[in-house]
């Protein structure tokens, strides 16, 4: 039996209520631009060369529970990024430290959690 083709992550789709608001927030945080737009959907440019694109699907229901999947963002200056998140309407939720590895859980304006840590 032939081995199936290996898949790669082409995009990460986030459900949202405010399509334009989420495109604006995440575009500013990740410094990516809108690439394709269709009614109720937007795909952004790739997050990094060869990496996945972030995409948004407008839905009517509100976020009800903790994310089952979230983004981990790394940056040379986590405090500056977290300040930028807050300026754009996001929120710092809580900090964690395990064996010297520190990260901060944040939320976008619709409550979707993501983590911020220092680049290695």
What do the PLM-derived regions correspond to, one by one?
Residues 18-33, 84-87:
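Amphipathic alpha-helical segments
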Residues 2-17, 35-36, 43-57, 61-120:
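Vicinal oxygen chelate
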Residues 39, 49-51, 64-68:
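Short connector loops at helix/strand junctions that flank enzyme active sites
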Residues 26, 57-60:
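Generic, ordered loop/turn and secondary-structure boundary motif
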Residues 18-19, 34, 40, 77-78, ...:
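A generic "binding-loop/recognition-motif" signal
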């Amino acid at each position: 039996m032939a081995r199936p083709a290996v898949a790669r992550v082409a995009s990460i789709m986030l459900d949202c209520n405010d399509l334009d608001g989420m495109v604006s927030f995440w575009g500013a945080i990740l410094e990516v631009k809108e690439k394709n737009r269709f009614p109720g959907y937007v795909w952004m440019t790739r997050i990094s060369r060869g990496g996945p694109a972030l995409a948004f699907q407008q839905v009517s229901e509100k976020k009800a529970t903790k994310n089952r999947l979230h983004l981990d963002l790394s940056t040379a200056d986590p405090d500056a990024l977290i300040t930028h998140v807050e300026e754009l309407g996001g929120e710092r939720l809580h900090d964690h430290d395990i064996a010297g590895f520190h990260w901060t859980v944040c939320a976008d304006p619709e409550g979707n959690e993501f983590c911020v840590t220092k680049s290695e």
